[in-house]
Each structure stands twice: as structure tokens, then as C-alpha cells.
């Protein structure tokens, strides 16, 4: 619980740092969310469990809804502890060394042949090497050694990257510091490690701010971060990784054994082709585009150029300061079932939960959105709309979410696609409640300019004629074709439009469950 509090306090600090080799400024949120998931699982477990059973349960909990690469490593680390400890009733310092050795091998399997010189896998190897040189092991010695190794790796990473270190390593420093404080208190000492590490990281982040901001605004290409579960018979971790590596720049894979002894793969990829990279059979997929949506400051005019006899200095500077309130992009989450629209959503700045098979996955996906801004959940069916409302209310009841989460009234893929595209580039300012109010108003205005209907099977020509009366100057009719009747519906639409030489059919092929949707924008 203490570690969860420490990581939640530091999430913004860690988000301001970088994760190498790909610029990725969400490590703080991913670490905090992953550890919160583990803490929530821990609260449901019996105190009489053996350490291995406890760690195995934590591993399954984190792997069920992993947050980025750090979630993969954390789940793998818990699983390694469970594997190392077996049936021992109490963990001794020497058993911690055994767990770290197992974790060393596990992390190498997660990352495969990828060489992360300053990454978490390299860190665990160093910790294992340092601990092997100790003759007498105490709990404090083990954790303090891990903390020193993490601090050294963080500093080395910063030296190697122009002053900006690896946020994952910085997070490891905080985790080990929290554990070191617990060990110190257990042995009758004062716990000061967390405050020391927080001060170190804060000072380091402040000094590297200029370099970090430059990296933050460097878009790492047209890649997508993709996280998914996968089940396979007679499939090794290495074999799965190799099959994914052909279309991915970064591949992390771990295998988690459930309470029934069945192995499940969890993978996190950076890939330019998220759908091509996926295995044939997989569960829900969480996808976001690795772009950067920077804050914008309104008014870039130098106020000093306005200082004449007609202006009061204080008033002018105060006005300029007020106009410098940052404009921020809202967090967008789309609950989609249309693979063909995934890139459309993601390139417009939305996180996409594709193929949701568990309503609780909405909460998992929502927690990946940036903090400190209003967020919008965009359903694409009546079922996902109802599930989104229920999940929002459930999160609110537990204090996990405030009134700044809005659920759009979209209930089809076409309306969702148009809404997300229309919100692309829009920024909002002010407190969260003000952002939410303005975002909700913008959604209502945009939805008023969208008309979408299920395609009529009996009176399609009449329906097209009615649509034609509403078409704007672009004279475009759009459609999301049903996956069940794709060829037939596309042909029927084209035949019905043959009477209108000046109307173009623009179809999003790939479809949605259920009936085909057609619509126009005003």
C-alpha cells in the first residue's frame, strides 16, 4: 500500500521523464496504475497464503489488465517470485536473492534479444550480481543493494541521454525506496529513503526539463502501442516473440499461468501495423498512436511591445499571464468493434479498446488516458454505451473517477468515427470541471451535425432520397458496412446511388457488428 501511495504521488514527475528507446511519456501513470491494480488484488487475499501463492495472485491481477511495458515487467516479476519461492511459508533474505535470480531470467525472456543497456532487465542483472558478492544477507542489505543499483542505473541512463534518464528506472528507484523504508521500520530504523529519492528525482527532472521537453515534442514515427492477451497450445514465448518481431520495433511478451495451470501470453508491441501484427486468435486489444499532443499556450505576443503610455504595466502583464492558460487535448477512449476504423480513431488521438469481451476492460483502458484533463468515452453500440455508463458510475462510487468523465451518446461506429475526427485538434482550458463542461457542449454541437441510420432493407431508395435532401455541398454519403453482409450491403448501396450522379458513396470497409450504418454530416 505504501508503494502504491509513493508511485501515485510521483506519477506526474515520472511522466515528465522519458522511456528509452522510444519517447513515451506515460511511464508514471502506467507504474501507478499497475501497482494500484496489485494493491487492489492484495486486499482480497487471505493473510494465511504462502508467499508464492500471494505473488502468483498479484501476477495474474496485473497481467489481466497490463499498463504498458512496465505492467508486463511487473507481472513477470511477481510471477518470478512465485516460481522461486514454491512452498516456503516465510520469505527470508536469502529467498529474496533466489527470487531476483529467477527474475533475472524472466526479464530476459520478456525482452528477448532486445538489448536495453539501461533498462529494467539490465538493472535486475546488476542487482543479482551485486547481491551474490554479499556474505551475510539481511532484509535491509538486500533492499538497500537493489536501491543503490537502481540509482546508479538511473544516473548512468541520464548521462547517456543528454541528462534525461529512463523513467522506468526512476520508478524502480521509488519502488525499492518504499520497500527499503518498510525494511528499515521492521528493523527499528527510520525510513528516509523515499523522501531522499523523491528529492533526487525532482532535482534531476528540473535540471533536464529543456531536454525532456524537446524529446516530448519528437514524434517517434507512425507507430502504435498495442497490448493484448493471447492463448496458444504448444507455443513458446520466444516463438511468439519472433512471429511478432517482423512487424514491430519493440516486443515484450510474458506468459502467466492462471489458477488452473493454463498459460496465457500477454504482449506489448510498438508497431506501425497494429492489426497485421496480431496473432489470429486474441482477446481484447488496447491500441494508441505514439504521437504527442502538446499543450498550447494562447497568445504568443510579447507584452513588452505593448507597454506605452496608454497601458498600465501591471494590467498588461496580468492580462498576458491570464491568456497563457494552457489549452489541453481531452482524453478520448473508443470502445470499438470495427478493425478497419482502428487507425482512424488512433491517428485522431484516441485510445482504442478493440473487441471488448469484459466490461471491466473499460476501466483498464480509461486509466491509460492522460491525467489532469477531461476525458470522453465513445461507445459504438447500444451495449457498449450501457456498459460505459455502468463502469463510469462504478468508478465514481469507488472514488476512482470524478465528474470529468463524459460518455458520448454514440451507438454506432460511423457516429463515433465522425465525433473523434471532429474533436481532433480541439483543445480546452481551465479546471477539470470547466474542461468537461466545454467538452460536453462540443460533443452535443458535433452530434447535432451528424445523421446516421441503419440501412433500410425494404425502402433503401426512399431512404437515399431523403438523405439526398439533407446532403451538403460535398454530396457525400458515408457508410460503415456490416461484417455479416459486407458484399451484399455494399452492392445494394451502389445500386441505390446509381440514380444520383452527383452523390458519392464513401464507405469505411471492415464493418461493424449488426446492421450497416449510413449517414451524412451537415
Predicted feature locations:
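N-terminal loops that bind phosphate or other acidic moieties
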Residues: 1-522
Amino acid at each position: 500500500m505504501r508503494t502504491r501511495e509513493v508511485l501515485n504521488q510521483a506519477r506526474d514527475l515520472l511522466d515528465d521523464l522519458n522511456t528509452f528507446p522510444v519517447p513515451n511519456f506515460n511511464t508514471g501513470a502506467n507504474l501507478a496504475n499497475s501497482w494500484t491494480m496489485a494493491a487492489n488484488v492484495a486486499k482480497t487475499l487471505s493473510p494465511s497464503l504462502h508467499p508464492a501463492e500471494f505473488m502468483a495472485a498479484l501476477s495474474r491481477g496485473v497481467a489481466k489488465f497490463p499498463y504498458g511495458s512496465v505492467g508486463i515487467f511487473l507481472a513477470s516479476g511477481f510471477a518470478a517470485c512465485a516460481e522461486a519461492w514454491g512452498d516456503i511459508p516465510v520469505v527470508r533474505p536469502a529467498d529474496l536473492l533466489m527470487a531476483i535470480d529467477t527474475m533475472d531470467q524472466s526479464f530476459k525472456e520478456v525482452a528477448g534479444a532486445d538489448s536495453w543497456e539501461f533498462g529494467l532487465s539490465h538493472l535486475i542483472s546488476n542487482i543479482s550480481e551485486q547481491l551474490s558478492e554479499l556474505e551475510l544477507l539481511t532484509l535491509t542489505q538486500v533492499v538497500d543493494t537493489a536501491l543503490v543499483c537502481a540509482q546508479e542505473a538511473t544516473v548512468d541512463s541520464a548521462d547517456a541521454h543528454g541528462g534525461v534518464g529512463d523513467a522506468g528506472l526512476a520508478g524502480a528507484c521509488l519502488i525499492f525506496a518504499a520497500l527499503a523504508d518498510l525494511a528499515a521500520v521492521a528493523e527499528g530504523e527510520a525510513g528516509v529513503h523515499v523522501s531522499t529519492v523523491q528529492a533526487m528525482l525532482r532535482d534531476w527532472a528540473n535540471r533536464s526539463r529543456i531536454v525532456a521537453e524537446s524529446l516530448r515534442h519528437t514524434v517517434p514515427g507512425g507507430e502504435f502501442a498495442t497490448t493484448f492477451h493471447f492463448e496458444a497450445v504448444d507455443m513458446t514465448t520466444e516463438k511468439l516473440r519472433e512471429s511478432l518481431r517482423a512487424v514491430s520495433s519493440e516486443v515484450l511478451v510474458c506468459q502467466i499461468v492462471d489458477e488452473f495451470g493454463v498459460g496465457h501470453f500477454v504482449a506489448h508491441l510498438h508497431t506501425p501495423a497494429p492489426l497485421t501484427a496480431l496473432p489470429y486468435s486474441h482477446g481484447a486489444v488496447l491500441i494508441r498512436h505514439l504521437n504527442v499532443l502538446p499543450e498550447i499556450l494562447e497568445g504568443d505576443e510579447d507584452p513588452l511591445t505593448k507597454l506605452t503610455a496608454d497601458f498600465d504595466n501591471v494590467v498588461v502583464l496580468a492580462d498576458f499571464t491570464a491568456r497563457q492558460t494552457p489549452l489541453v487535448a481531452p482524453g478520448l477512449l473508443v470502445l470499438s468493434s470495427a478493425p478497419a476504423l482502428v487507425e482512424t480513431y488512433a491517428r485522431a488521438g484516441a485510445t482504442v479498446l478493440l473487441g471488448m469481451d469484459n466490461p471491466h476492460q473499460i476501466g483498464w483502458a480509461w486509466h491509460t488516458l492522460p491525467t489532469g484533463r477531461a476525458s470522453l468515452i465513445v461507445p459504438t453500440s447500444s451495449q457498449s454505451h450501457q456498459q460505459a455508463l455502468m463502469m463510469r458510475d462504478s468508478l465514481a462510487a469507488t472514488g476512482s473517477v470524478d465528474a470529468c468523465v463524459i460518455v458520448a451518446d454514440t451507438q454506432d461506429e460511423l457516429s463515433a468515427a465522425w465525433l473523434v475526427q471532429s474533436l481532433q485538434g480541439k483543445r480546452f482550458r481551465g479546471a477539470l470541471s470547466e474542461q468537461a463542461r466545454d467538452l460536453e457542449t462540443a460533443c452535443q454541437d458535433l452530434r447535432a451535425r451528424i445523421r446516421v441510420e441503419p440501412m433500410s432493407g425494404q425502402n433503401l431508395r426512399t431512404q437515399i432520397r431523403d438523405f439526398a435532401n439533407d446532403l451538403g455541398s460535398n454530396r457525400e454519403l458515408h457508410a460503415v458496412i456490416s461484417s455479416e453482409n459486407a458484399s451484399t450491403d455494399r452492392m445494394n448501396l451502389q445500386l441505390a446511388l446509381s440514380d444520383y450522379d452527383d452523390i458519392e458513396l464513401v464507405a469505411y470497409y471492415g464493418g461493424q457488428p449488426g446492421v450497416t450504418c449510413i449517414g451524412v454530416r451537415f
